[in-house]
From Swiss-Prot:
The keyword Heme does not apply. Keywords: ATP-binding, Cell membrane, Kinase, Membrane, Nucleotide-binding, Phosphoprotein, Repeat, Serine/threonine-protein kinase, Transferase, Transmembrane, Transmembrane helix. Residues 1-482 are cytoplasmic. Residues 504-710 are periplasmic. Autophosphorylated on serine and threonine residues. Residues 308-349, 404-461, 507-634 are annotated as: Disordered. Sequence repeats lie at residues 337-348, 358-369. This is Serine/threonine-protein kinase pkn6. It comes from Myxococcus xanthus. ATP binds at residues 12-20, 38. It catalyses: L-seryl-[protein] + ATP = O-phospho-L-seryl-[protein] + ADP + H(+); L-threonyl-[protein] + ATP = O-phospho-L-threonyl-[protein] + ADP + H(+). Pkn5 and pkn6 may have reciprocal roles in growth and development. Pkn6 may be a transmembrane sensor of external signals for development. The chain crosses the membrane at residues 483-503.
Length: 710
C-alpha cells in the first residue's frame, strides 16, 4: 500500500488518534530509508479545526532535534488522510518492559536511567526557543506514558509523539479514555482543566517510573472515573509496599515527582533527571547505552514482524511493492494467464496453440510444447533480449505416432506425467521452409474429461467431448528465404485427426489416420445451441470431413480426403489468443463455407482452417454418442451492501458474524445489508460483549459502544 511517496511495509500499532506503519522511502540508484508513518484516523481528518491545530503542532515538533526525541521528517496528506513520517526506532516501548516488570523485578538503576534519559529529552523540548524570535515556546508534551517512550536495541531512549498530544488535549478535543490508560498519567491540575506547565510531564514520568519498578500503577483503580477520583483525592500506594527492595533514595524521588500539589513537585524535568542520575551513580553500577541494549536483548529477544501488506488489504497488515512484484513474478512463472481478448506479447515464429502450462523457470524464453492428454500445446514465452534470435528460426516439434490406445493412456495419465512426456524439441534446422502444423489429438477415455482448456475458467476442468477433423495450410514463401507465416490454429479436444507436416517445396499434404476409442454414451438430449450459434443435433451420424490445402507459391492444390466412422459434431475451432489477432502479426483462423475444399491465402494473408458440418448417413438408428455441453453460466445478482464503522471506547477486537475484523480503530468495512452479529473483546478490561447491528444498503452505519461502561 502506498501513502504519498512512502511504501507501507506492515502495521506496527493503532490507537485512538492514529495508526502506525513501518514504511520505506525509495530514491534513485537504490537509495532506501526505513521510517515510521503515522496516519491520522479518518474521523479526525474530517475536522478542519483539528487538522489545523495538528498541522501547527507538527511544524513545531519537526524543529526538535535531540538524541532522546524521535525526529519528524515529513508531514503530508494522501487520500484524504494526514500523516507524519518520523524516525524508525528498532526496539520496544516501555509498555513491554512494564509487563515484564509484572513478572520479574527490573533493576532499580536500569529503571532510573531510562526515565532520566526520557526526562532529558523532555527538558530539551520544554526549554526550546523559537528560531526567529528566540523566545521560549513553552512546549509541553501532555501525553507522556510508557507507550510514548521507546528503547532501541542500541540502548537509546526516545520520546515520541511530541506535540501531537497537546492538540488532543485542547478543550473539547480531550479524548478521555480513547487511548487506553492516558488518564492514569494526568496530574490533578490537568484533570481539573487548570493552567498547565512543564510539571505536567514531571508527574507523568513519575508514574512511568513507578510502573517500571512495580509493574503496577500507583492506584488500585480500574475505570477512568475511579482513577480520576484517586488522583484527585487519594494518596498513591507507596512503592515500598509493593517492592520493599527499592532504595530509599529512589522512593524519595518518586514521592516528589508524584506530589498532588505541583508546588511540591520537581520544578521541571531537568531537576528530575539530575536526581535520577545521582541515584544511578550511587549504586556504583555502570548503566549506559551498552548495558541498556543488553537488557533489551535479554528481556525482549525478538519483535515479531506482522505479515507484509498486500495490495488488496490496504491499510491492514500486510506488503511492500517489491514483495508484490515478486509474488506476481512467481505467479506468472507458475501459471501464465491466457487472455483471448487482449493479446500482449506476440508469439515467436514457432507454434501457436492454447496455453495453460507452467513456465519452466530455467528456460523462460524458449517456447516449450507440452503434451497434455494427447493435445500438443506450446507455451508462450516472455519477452527477452534473445527473443529476436529465437523468432528467426522455425521450431520443429516431433511427436510420436498417434494411436488410439496410446492416446487413451495419455488421457488417463496424471496431468503432471502427461506434461513431461510425448514431445521433443529439436534445435532449429537449416531449412527455413519447414513448418509444423498440428491439427489433431487423441480423445480421452470413455467417461473421461478432456484436459485441453481454452479459457482461464477451463484451465482445471474440461467437459467437452466433441470431435471433428481439420487440415490447415500455411503460406511458405517469403523474401530472403524466411518463413512468411506459421500455423495459426490448433483445434482443441479432437477425437480423430492428423498431424500434417507442410513443406514449401510443393510436397503433398498427407494426413495420418487415427482410430479413436468410442465416445461416452450419454442419454438422449434435445438440441443445444453451440458456441457458434448452430444447433447441436441429438443424433450424430458418421461424417466425412474434406480438407483442402493450397500451396501459396504456385497455386498447386492438394485435396486429401479423410473419413472416419466416428460420429462427430461440428464445433467452432478453439484457437490461441494471438492466432486471432491481426496486429500480433500471426495468421488468423476463420470459419470456412460448407462446400468441400479449402485454400490458403497468398503470401502475407491469413491462414484459413476449413471444415464441413456433419452429414447424416441415413441410418435410422441414432448413434449413442452424445455431446456434453457446459451448462450456461448464471450471473448472480449483486448483493446490496452498506458501510459499517466501529467506534469502540477504549478499543476492542471486533468480530462480525463470526469473522474477526481486527482491533479498533480501523476503517469502515463494506458489508451486505441486513442484521449482523458483532462481538467485541477487550482482554485488558475482561470484556466480551455481543451486539446486533442493522446495516442498510447504500448507507453508512456507525456502531458505537463504551466498553468501560458495560
Amino acid at each position: 500500500m502506498q501513502i504519498g511517496k512512502y511504501q507501507l511495509v506492515r502495521k506496527l500499532a493503532s490507537g485512538g488518534m492514529a495508526e502506525v506503519f513501518l514504511a520505506k522511502a525509495a530514491g534513485p540508484r537504490g537509495f532506501e530509508k526505513t521510517l515510521v508513518l503515522k496516519r491520522i484516523l479518518p474521523h479526525l481528518a474530517e475536522d478542519a479545526a483539528f487538522v489545523e491545530m495538528f498541522l501547527g503542532e507538527a511544524r513545531l515538533a519537526a524543529q526538535l532535534e535531540h538524541p532522546n526525541i524521535v525526529q519528524i521528517f515529513d508531514f503530508g496528506e494522501a487520500e484524504g488522510s494526514f500523516f507524519l513520517a518520523m524516525e524508525f526506532i528498532d526496539g520496544p516501548n516501555l509498555r513491554k518492559l512494564v509487563k515484564r516488570a509484572a513478572e520479574e523485578a527490573l533493576p532499580p538503576a536500569f529503571c532510573a536511567k531510562v526515565v532520566a534519559a526520557a526526562a532529558e529529552g523532555l527538558a530539551y523540548a520544554h526549554e526550546f526557543r523559537d528560531v526567529e524570535t528566540g523566545e521560549p515556546l513553552g512546549l509541553i508534551h501532555r501525553d507522556v506514558s510508557p507507550d510514548n517512550i521507546l528503547v532501541s536495541r542500541q540502548g537509546a531512549v526516545k520520546v515520541v509523539d511530541f506535540g501531537i498530544a497537546k492538540v488532543a488535549g485542547q478543550g473539547h478535543r480531550t479524548l478521555t479514555g480513547v487511548v487506553k490508560g492516558k488518564v492514569a498519567y494526568m496530574p490533578p491540575e490537568q484533570l481539573q482543566a487548570k493552567a498547565m506547565d512543564r510539571r505536567v510531564d514531571v508527574y507523568a514520568l513519575g508514574v512511568v517510573l513507578y510502573e517500571l519498578l512495580t509493574g503496577k500503577r500507583p492506584f488500585d483503580a480500574t475505570t477512568d472515573v475511579s482513577v480520576m477520583q484517586a488522583i484527585l483525592f487519594e494518596s498513591f500506594i507507596p512503592v515500598s509496599a509493593r517492592r520493599p527492595d527499592v532504595p530509599v533514595a529512589l522512593q524519595q524521588v518518586l514521592d516528589k515527582a508524584l506530589a498532588k500539589d505541583r508546588e511540591r513537585r520537581y520544578a521541571d524535568c531537568r531537576a528530575l533527571q539530575d536526581d535520577l542520575e545521582r541515584f544511578v551513580l550511587s549504586t556504583g553500577e555502570p548503566v549506559g547505552a551498552y548495558q541498556i541494549a543488553q537488557r533489551i536483548a535479554q528481556w525482549v529477544p525478538e519483535v515479531a514482524a506482522a505479515p507484509a501488506m498486500t495490495p488488496s488489504q490496504g491499510g491492514s497488515k500486510g506488503a511492500v511493492a517489491s514483495q508484490a512484484k515478486a509474488d506476481a513474478r512467481s505467479a506468472s512463472m507458475v501459471s501464465p494467464p491466457v487472455d483471448s481478448t487482449s493479446p500482449t506479447t506476440p508469439m515467436p515464429r514457432s507454434l501457436v496453440a492454447p496455453v495453460e502450462v507452467p513456465a519452466d523457470s530455467t528456460s523462460p524464453t524458449t517456447p516449450m510444447p507440452v503434451a497434455i492428454g494427447g493435445v500438443v500445446q506450446a507455451l508462450e514465452p516472455r519477452s527477452s533480449p534473445q527473443q529476436d534470435t529465437l523468432q528467426s528460426y522455425p521450431v520443429v516439434v516431433k511427436t510420436p505416432a498417434l494411436r488410439a490406445d496410446a492416446s487413451a493412456r495419455g488421457a488417463s495419465r496424471p496431468r503432471a506425467q502427461s506434461r513431461a512426456s510425448g514431445v521433443k524439441v529439436q534445435a532449429p534446422q537449416a531449412r527455413d521452409e519447414d513448418v509444423v502444423a498440428m491439427a489433431a489429438a487423441s480423445s480421452p477415455p470413455s467417461g473421461g474429461a478432456s484436459p485441453a482448456p481454452t479459457t482461464p475458467e477451463d484451465a482445471d476442468d474440461a467437459v467437452h467431448t466433441r470431435s471433428t477433423e481439420y487440415a490447415a495450410t500455411v503460406p511458405s514463401g517469403r523474401p530472403g528465404g524466411r518463413i512468411a507465416g506459421i500455423v495459426g490454429a490448433v483445434v482443441a479436444l479432437l477425437v480423430g485427426g492428423a498431424v500434417t507436416v507442410m513443406r514449401g517445396d510443393d510436397s503433398e499434404v498427407s494426413p495420418v489416420r487415427v482410430n479413436p476409442p468410442p465416445l461416452t454414451h450419454l442419454p438422449r438430449e434435445p438440441a443445444v445451441p453451440s458456441q457458434g450459434g448452430r444447433n447441436v443435433p441429438q443424433e450424430k451420424p458418421a461424417a466425412n470431413v474434406n480438407a483442402g490445402a493450397r500451396d501459396s507459391n504456385d497455386g498447386a492444390q492438394a485435396k486429401p480426403q479423410v473419413s472416419t466412422d466416428v460420429s462427430v459434431v461440428p464445433q467452432e475451432p478453439h484457437v490461441a489468443r494471438d492466432a486471432t489477432t491481426p496486429e500480433a502479426g500471426l495468421p488468423t483462423v476463420k470459419d470456412a463455407p460448407p462446400e468441400n475444399g479449402g485454400a490458403a491465402s497468398k503470401e502475407g494473408s491469413a491462414v484459413v482452417a476449413k471444415r464441413e458440418p456433419a452429414k447424416a448417413s441415413g441410418d435410422p438408428e441414432p448413434n449413442p454418442s452424445r455431446v456434453r455441453e457446459r451448462a450456461p453460466t448464471q450471473k448472480v445478482a449483486a448483493v446490496a451492501k452498506g458501510r459499517l464503522e466501529f467506534r469502540i471506547r477504549p478499543y476492542a477486537v471486533v468480530s462480525l458474524d463470526g469473522k474477526v475484523l481486527g482491533q479498533t480503530p480501523f476503517a469502515a468495512v463494506e458489508v451486505p445489508e441486513g442484521r449482523h452479529t458483532v462481538r467485541l473483546v477487550n482482554k485488558e478490561l475482561g470484556k466480551d460483549v455481543t451486539r446486533t447491528v442493522d446495516v442498510k444498503a447504500g448507507q453508512a452505519t456507525v456502531f458505537k459502544l463504551n466498553l468501560e461502561a458495560e
